């Protein structure tokens, strides 16, 4: 299997495993990845998802260019490929639970697109990130581009797209493409994921949903966001949090 889902307690890890091709994503993988994300979201025992490579020193080299060259003359394939890539980005970006990318190597083109669709990105010092359609004569989709603009702002997004440059980890951190540089990104992501998993899940998932609404242009509360606030006071997590605070102990959510 070139993609697989592993579980460790409340954390699932989605592994990209195609090392001979530097984890380049072919059509079958683009179609499979959203299903694995949905599997993790549907598993009530899972609270956080990590996206990473099964092979140290790699993340994802993007789309399979050999497949592009072989199949791009087929309009039906182009439509299916565009739909599968968008479905992958959407599944990661709209996942109700937190998603962390652990990047230990190059995240290029569609590989960088996978990373920016996650909530947080932890990279090794050796990581490089870039979005390179301008070197291939192709166009990055609007949904993917919005994720980039939301993350780094329009001016930096334009520079990333227009230059098609690869950015080392320090530069990627400086421009906001990643959140942290650590020598063992998967271990750090796992530690962070377990810390998140120990917190109140209604709080985390509601916060993620509210941030998403803000990025989509919503500027004030509506009935759904007001309900998130009100409902929190009726849930077991609130009662446990208050009791733990009063008892000077860690809450058990």
Task: Kindly give the residue locations of the regions a language model identified.
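Glycine-rich phosphate-binding loop at the start of an alpha helix
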Residues: 62, 82, 86, 109, ...
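Acidic, divalent-metal-coordinating active-site segment for phosphoryl/phosphodiester hydrolysis
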Residues: 165-171
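Short loop-to-helix capping motifs
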Residues: 18-19, 43, 74, 199, ...
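Conserved CoA-thioester-binding segment of acyl-CoA-metabolizing enzymes
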Residues: 1-52, 90
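C-terminal long alpha-helix characteristic of the crotonase
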Residues: 122-127, 178-224, 230, 234-236, ...
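CoA-thioester-processing core
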Residues: 88-94, 102, 108-161, 175, ...
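Glycine- (often His-adjacent) and acidic-residue-rich active-site loop
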Residues: 53-88, 217
């Amino acid at each position: 299997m070139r993609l697989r889902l592993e579980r460790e307690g409340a954390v699932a890890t989605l592994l990209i495993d195609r090392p001979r091709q530097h984890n380049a994503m072919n059509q079958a993988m683009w179609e499979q990845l959203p299903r694995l994300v949905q599997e993790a979201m549907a598993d009530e025992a899972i609270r956080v998802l990590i996206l990473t490579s099964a092979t140290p020193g790699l993340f994802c080299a993007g789309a399979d260019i050999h497949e592009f060259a072989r199949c791009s003359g087929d309009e039906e394939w182009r439509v299916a490929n565009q739909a599968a890539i968008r479905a992958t980005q959407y599944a990661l970006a709209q996942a109700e639970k937190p998603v962390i990318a652990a990047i230990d190597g190059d995240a290029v083109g569609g590989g960088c697109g996978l990373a920016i669709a996650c909530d947080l990105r932890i990279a090794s010092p050796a990581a490089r990130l870039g979005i390179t359609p301008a070197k291939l004569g192709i166009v990055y989709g609007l949904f993917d581009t919005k994720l980039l603009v939301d993350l780094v702002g329009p001016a930096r997004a334009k520079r990333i797209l227009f230059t098609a440059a690869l950015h080392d980890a320090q530069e990627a951190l400086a421009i906001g493409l990643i959140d942290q540089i650590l020598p063992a990104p998967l271990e750090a992501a796992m530690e962070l994921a377990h810390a998140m998993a120990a917190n109140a899940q209604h709080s985390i998932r509601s916060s993620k949903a509210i941030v998403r609404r803000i990025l989509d242009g919503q500027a004030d509360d509506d009935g759904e966001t007001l309900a998130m606030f009100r409902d929190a006071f009726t849930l077991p997590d609130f009662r446990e949090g208050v009791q733990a605070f009063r008892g000077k102990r860690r809450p058990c959510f």
